[in-house]
Regions:
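Cyclophilin-like peptidyl-prolyl cis-trans isomerases
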Residues: 1-274
Length: 274
């Protein structure tokens, strides 16, 4: 007990520092707007990503980390194993996992397939116009400089509107080298190397990447090579029979007096310097 008491002042300081950081960020949002603050945060994260090695980018590893989830899409063409990134894309990950456990995706078709681009599913209507999130409303894109539309990426499909993520998702299938398209956009070296194996860089920051295929890309390619009609819908009915949650993730709920409410997502990270 004495040892615990010894660290109480330090814990209090860290909590106050964290709340101070959150308070200042909220003030900045109120004065300058969300876009300004979000861009500033993203720029700071990008600077860190540009200096990082391969291990900083979870898509580049086939291993499922302790802070990651794992699912298997059992399709009519075979299994696709995907790991999810709840700490980097909390909303998209929670949405997908809850839908999977509720069997929302069971029996849905791959309604849109574009060869050498991507395969898309998650729409109960089967035509690209349906589906909703677990919150019954759309949610915003979660951009991060640590996740990209490289080959095998799992991402949320949206309409282009500000908060239009629902239930639809796509898997990037393109195999062609995309590294030359990156130019001087500031991509981290490990990601440039990954794009040499294919991907869709035009989708970066526009769509939320929240997972990566770690097994079953041959199945993705099989679906990607299907014959389609003029609306990019496969002429052969290919379905997601079920989505098995192999490794779940517990999303923590944090209550603070500052906000007077609930903040749901990933556990708070006290910044090194507030």
């Amino acid at each position: 007990m004495k040892n615990i008491k010894k660290y109480i002042p330090l814990i209090i300081v860290l909590v106050i520092a964290g709340l101070g950081f959150a308070f200042r960020e909220n003030i900045s949002r109120a004065v300058r707007g969300d876009a300004y603050v979000d861009n500033k945060i993203f720029t700071k994260q990008l600077e860190k990503a540009q200096k990082s090695g391969k291990d900083a980018f979870p898509q580049l590893s086939d291993k499922v980390g302790k802070d990651e989830a794992e699912v298997i899409l059992h399709t009519s063409k075979g299994d696709i194993t995907v790991k999810l990134f709840p700490t980097l894309a909390p909303k998209a990950s929670e949405n997908f996992l809850k839908h999977a456990k509720d069997k929302y995706y069971d029996g849905l078709t791959f309604h849109r397939v574009i060869k050498d681009f991507m395969i898309q599913s998650g729409d109960p209507k089967g035509d690209g116009t349906g589906g909703e999130s677990i919150w019954k409303k759309g949610f915003a894109v979660e951009p991060t400089p640590f996740l990209y539309n490289i080959r095998g990426a799992l991402a949320m499909a949206n309409t282009g509107a500000k908060e239009s993520n629902g239930s639809q998702f796509y898997i990037v299938q393109n195999k062609d080298d995309q590294s030359k398209q990156l130019g001087n956009a500031g991509y981290p070296k490990p990601i440039i190397d990954a794009y040499k194996k294919g991907g869709y860089p035009a989708g970066d920051t526009k769509y939320t990447v929240f997972g990566q295929v770690i097994k079953g890309m041959d199945v993705v390619d099989t679906i990607g090579n299907l014959e389609v009609d003029d609306n990019s819908k496969p002429k052969e009915n290919v379905t997601v029979n079920s989505v098995e949650v192999v490794k779940d993730y517990k999303f923590k709920i944090i209550t603070t007096r500052l906000t007077g409410g609930l903040i749901k997502g990933y556990k708070p990270i006290i910044p090194a310097s507030a």
